[in-house]
Amino acid sequence: MRMLLGSFAVYAAAALCEIGGCYAWWCWRRAGAGAWVLLPGMASLALFGWLLTLVDSDTAGRTFAAYGGIYIVGAIVWLRLVEGRPVTLRDAAGVAICLAGAAIILSAGRGAER
């Protein structure tokens, strides 16, 4: 259980970094922000990559697959809190399905392919 909670914390931090970094590019290209927003955006994306290496997993693919579910939750939270858009029933259903998938992958743990 401790590994799952630790992985979740790393995944949540990674999602914040990835979404924030990508949002900087979005703001520059689509919302008219100055190019200066790209510097913290790139730093955030670099931190995202480093954070994923902290997850206790034998394989990058399993780490990235489990992270995908957490990323989707983070993106929907971002939609609501940063962009001020409502979360729809379909958003919530999609999040639930993705979290179930991430939980299955995470619960397999190390050495699951044996």
Curated annotation (Swiss-Prot):
Sequence intervals crossing the membrane: 8-28, 35-55, 64-84, 92-112
Swiss-Prot/TrEMBL keywords: Cell inner membrane, Cell membrane, Membrane, Transmembrane, Transmembrane helix
Subcellular location per the Swiss-Prot or TrEMBL entry: Cell inner membrane
UniProt membrane topology term: Multi-pass membrane protein
Domain of life, per lineage: Bacteria
Chief location category: membrane
Record's keyword annotation contains Ribosomal protein: no
Pfam families for the chain: UPF0060 (PF02694)
InterPro entries: UPF0060
Entry's Gene Ontology cellular component terms: plasma membrane
Sections of the chain in a coiled coil: none
NCBIfam families: PRK02237.1 (NF002586)
HAMAP family for the chain: UPF0060
PANTHER family: UPF0060 MEMBRANE PROTEIN YNFA
Name by which UniProt lists this protein: UPF0060 membrane protein GDI3492/Gdia_2889
